[in-house]
Curated annotation (Swiss-Prot):
Main location class: virion
Region feature (Essential for glycoprotein binding): 115-151
Localization per Swiss-Prot or TrEMBL: Virion membrane; Host endomembrane system; Host cytoplasm
InterPro entries: Rhabdo_M, Rhabdovirus_M_sf
One of the record's GO cellular component terms: host cell cytoplasm
Notes concerning its domains: Late-budding domains (L domains) are short sequence motifs essential for viral particle budding. They recruit proteins of the host ESCRT machinery (Endosomal Sorting Complex Required for Transport) or ESCRT-associated proteins. Matrix protein contains one L domain: a PPXY motif which potentially interacts with the WW domain 3 of NEDD4 E3 ubiquitin ligase (Potential).
Annotated keywords: Apoptosis, Host cytoplasm, Host membrane, Host-virus interaction, Membrane, Viral budding, Viral budding via the host ESCRT complexes, Viral envelope protein, Viral matrix protein, Viral release from host cell, Virion
Domain of life per record: Viruses
Organism: Rabies virus (strain HEP-Flury)
Extra remark beyond the main annotation: Most abundant protein in the virion.
Record-given protein name: Matrix protein
Membrane topology: Peripheral membrane protein
Subunit: Homomultimer. Interacts with nucleoprotein and with the cytoplasmic domain of glycoprotein. Interacts with host ATP6V1A; this interaction plays an important role in virion uncoating after viral entry.
Amino acid sequence: MNFLCKIVKNCRDEDTQKPSPASAPPDGDDLWLPPPEYVPLKELTSKKNMRNFCINGEVKVCSPNGYSFRILRHILRSFDEIYSGNHRMIGLVKVVVGLALSGAPAPEGMNWVYKLRRTLIFQWADSRGPLEGEELEHSQEITWDDDTEFVGLQMRVSARQCHIQGRIWCIDMNSRACQLWSDMSLQTQRSEEDKDSSLLLE
């Protein structure tokens, strides 16, 4: 029976050994996607609860026998239950993880590494979201294991408020990249003031 658990299995960088490289997800996989499109920075009408964050995100997938995005989606569907970071920033973390996994991975030993380094504009509805000046340094490993397969998912997200011009993180909730956010049950609503932006509800 497949199950999710947090266990102490580390995806080590094998510097001395030369293991067989992990295979990339097949071309026909339903979520082997190009990076999502961003809209050019524009002046937002509403400044309420809007913050620019300098983001560094990394998602490392460790699987000795290769992996499928279907397994990653299975893991991400339980994100709310397994997330161990600051819950005022869970929405931001979901956005970053989704954007990172929508990019192209780089092989690293037995691992595949997805990285995201951006300055992104986030807006939260009402009084939700991080406190003013609050920063995030979150690192977590989630594993999926059964009798035949092991997949480790290491997530590292750092976010600090900055004054560098950024980009709106998502303008089309029907885009392909948003499938991952749907898997993680990302809670958003369309901004009434700025139709091209989305407000985080978490």
